[in-house]
Amino acid sequence: MNATLNGGDGTGSNGTGSGAGDRRTHRRILGLDFFIGGAAEAVDCMDGGGLLVVPAAPALKNLDRDAGYREALQHADLRITDSAFMVLVWNFLERDRIRRLSGLEYVVELFGRADVRRPGATLWIMAGPTSAARNVAWLQKQGFHVCPEDVYMAPMYSDEIADTRLLEILGQRRPKHVVITVGGGTQERLGLYLKRRLPYLPAIHCIGAAIAFLSGDQVHIPRWADRSYLGWLFRCASNPKRFVPRYWEARQLFGLMVRYRSTLPGALSPPAAPAPAGHPASHE
């Protein structure tokens, strides 16, 4: 695995790893080392496998009270600065100048890589039939060869993630990439479940709604709007009842960051050793 990645299940309780302490590539925010480089470098970091997460403010605000989500972020191998709100608050509090690396920017770079586009190299975990149909149609228009066997329809997971059927499929097919497009807060826990229980380590990309902004499954977000930290506004305008309350509640992240800054909120037990394969541990 690329040395820029954090240590995953070998990390300390504050989510540090091989990249920790290097301010050229990481910042420790809320006790988690966030990668602050560019999209191409982030995708390169995942070449050897691992778990990538794209934490957004609506889920990050629960970091102090959602132990499962907190554990998933702690044990991720790469965390990117998708949350514009988190980046703005951090730069204000710390007089820093870190840049945002959005999930959309990461996905555009990832989807341009030949090894992701190779037939059979990627398993796509989709949130439901309607989303899957739109996403697959868009992928095929972009030149991806996606057959039905390449798509897994995620069930409605409970707080305790368990999906032995998915483990069996991945164990048999062994794709290099697993792209998870379900909702934030769930996808990270699913990614950690797979990382701990699969007999090999694929690159697990928890990209959430990023593909939906490209496929039309959700509102299209222009690249200029994404770069200007305005993606949330487009989502709110497209579906106010759904997204306005979500982003309004995300303001709680400000208080969390003022209180904890670079410290991990909540008590977290030491990392557990990966469980043997086959022993199990809301959609967007």
Residue ranges of model-derived segments:
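Short glycine-rich anion-binding loops that position phosphate/pyrophosphate groups of nucleotides
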Residues: 57-60, 85, 182-187, 210-211
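A short helix->loop->beta-strand "cap" motif at the edges of active sites that frequently abuts
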Residues: 49, 119, 199-203
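Short Gly/Thr/Asp-enriched flexible loops that form oxyanion-binding sites at enzyme active sites
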Residues: 136, 188-197
